[in-house]
């Protein structure tokens, strides 16, 4: 397994797919990285030379990926919570942040249902 940005990427897959195992790199970014490094998208990771791996690593080092990106996202959310913005309040309460309806769905964000027992008359 090749190790890029602290992540073991699978050897048997195409490079373009393997790069998406790194947090912060999707298909489009992976294609741009390979274009800049001058590596074909169709090559398998096991067929890459050390030189090509080095070029890919150099390009990825310029991007914000893995731990740095996760830290930035969490700090952005903390900032929203601290300043008390609407989005911060929604984050704090564990509700959808982007204006979705919460009457029926939003179970992913709210978690499993908590049933309330009926009062006997």
From Swiss-Prot:
Residues 93-121 are annotated as: Disordered. Residues 106-121 have a biased composition (Basic residues). It holds the Pfam family Ribosomal_S13. It comes from the Bacteria. The keyword GTP-binding does not apply. PROSITE patterns: RIBOSOMAL_S13_1 (PS00646), RIBOSOMAL_S13_2 (PS50159). Keywords: Ribonucleoprotein, Ribosomal protein, RNA-binding, rRNA-binding, tRNA-binding. GO terms for molecular function: rRNA binding; structural constituent of ribosome; tRNA binding. GO terms for cellular component: cytosol; small ribosomal subunit. One of its GO terms (biological process) is translation. The keyword Metal-binding does not apply. Located at the top of the head of the 30S subunit, it contacts several helices of the 16S rRNA. In the 70S ribosome it contacts the 23S rRNA (bridge B1a) and protein L5 of the 50S subunit (bridge B1b), connecting the 2 subunits; these bridges are implicated in subunit movement. Contacts the tRNAs in the A and P-sites. Belongs to the universal ribosomal protein uS13 family. HAMAP family: Ribosomal_uS13. Part of the 30S ribosomal subunit. Forms a loose heterodimer with protein S19. Forms two bridges to the 50S subunit in the 70S ribosome. NCBIfam families: uS13_bact (TIGR03631). PANTHER family: 30S RIBOSOMAL PROTEIN S13/40S RIBOSOMAL PROTEIN S18, SMALL RIBOSOMAL SUBUNIT PROTEIN US13M. This is Small ribosomal subunit protein uS13. It comes from Bacillus licheniformis (strain ATCC 14580 / DSM 13 / JCM 2505 / CCUG 7422 / NBRC 12200 / NCIMB 9375 / NCTC 10341 / NRRL NRS-1264 / Gibson 46).
């Amino acid at each position: 397994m090749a190790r890029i940005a602290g992540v073991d990427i699978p050897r048997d897959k195409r490079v373009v797919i393997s790069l998406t195992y790194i947090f912060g790199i999707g298909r489009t970014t992976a294609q741009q990285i390979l274009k800049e490094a001058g590596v074909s998208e169709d090559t398998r990771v096991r067929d890459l030379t050390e030189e090509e791996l080095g070029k890919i690593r150099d390009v990825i080092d310029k991007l914000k990926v893995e731990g740095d990106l996760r830290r930035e996202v969490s700090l952005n959310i903390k900032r929203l919570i601290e300043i008390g913005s609407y989005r911060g309040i929604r984050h704090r309460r564990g509700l959808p942040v982007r204006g979705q309806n919460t009457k029926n769905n939003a179970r992913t964000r709210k978690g499993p249902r908590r049933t309330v027992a009926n009062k006997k008359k």
